[in-house]
Amino acid sequence: MHSATPTTPPSRPTAQAAPKTHTHHGLWADLKSPDFLALDRHRAIAVLPLGATEQHGPHLPLSVDSDLADCILSKALGLANGAANCPSVLALPLQPVGFSPEHARFPGTLSLSSKTL
């Protein structure tokens, strides 16, 4: 007597499952192109930090505003990393230029028009 072993019929192909998503907090430029496929685009925030390059007197570097923006951004990313159910937060490269026509007479100032910004 031959006993038949029950077999499961092969499954039919179904629609491809959506890729698993993950949360990432950090610098946009640190990701590889394929990493963006794993991000939930509906729960991702891109932050564009701006920091004017302008004089702050003879005793401070022109990068003060950019340095402050970078510090605030680092703190915000740290808070996002510690937060539950937080969307992905990706920081774009800091743009070290702003609208600074009042500083135009000082050497080293970088300024864009308000229309350009």
What do the predicted segments below correspond to?
Residues 6-117:
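N-terminal catalytic or cofactor-binding beta/alpha core of small enzyme domains
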